[in-house]
């Protein structure tokens, strides 16, 4: 029974990890509909789409296992971003995603331990966490490339 509860904890943390992220806030508040760099906006849309996919998949497992879906809320501090250019936020988004990647690695360790106790039923959870880590690594690469491109554009267009 404890391993089943541990699986619920891992899945709930995974959902909150993505759902309460600054990237998800940007998506849900439509901040990226404002004027700004289109390539950066498209990259952010792709990243958030992947994150939403992980949330959906984790929630599907939670429902199938008859677990409660976690509640999540955005920090009030995020509302201060409404008048800020996305390029200005990019370093903050990268730093936040790096922290979330470390949290995912801890979740992976917990999920692996559950698989040992519970078997294949928890294997889906462990695999989902592994996929999320791999995706986040790719997302960080994409965001760092965008950051580098934007810095190069500033230096080449400066007088």
Predicted regions and their residues:
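A short small-residue
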Residues: 1, 30-35, 77-81
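Inter-helical turn/loop segments and adjacent helix faces that build the functional surface
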Residues: 30-39, 108-124, 149-158
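Short, contiguous alpha-helical
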Residues: 58, 125-159
């Amino acid at each position: 029974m404890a391993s089943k509860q541990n699986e619920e904890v891992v899945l709930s943390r995974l959902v909150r990890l993505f759902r309460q992220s600054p990237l998800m806030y940007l998506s849900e508040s439509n901040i990226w509909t404002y004027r700004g760099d289109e390539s950066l906006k498209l990259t952010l849309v792709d990243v958030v789409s992947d994150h939403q996919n992980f949330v959906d998949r984790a929630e599907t497992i939670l429902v199938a296992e008859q677990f409660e879906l976690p509640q999540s809320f955005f920090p009030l501090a995020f509302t201060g971003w409404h008048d800020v250019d996305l390029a200005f936020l990019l370093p903050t988004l990268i730093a936040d995603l790096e922290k979330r990647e470390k949290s995912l690695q801890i979740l992976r360790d917990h999920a692996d331990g559950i698989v040992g106790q519970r078997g294949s039923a928890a294997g889906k959870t462990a695999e989902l966490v592994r996929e999320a880590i791999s995706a986040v690594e790719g997302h960080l690469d994409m965001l760092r490339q965008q950051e580098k491109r934007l810095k190069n554009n500033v230096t080449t267009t400066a007088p």
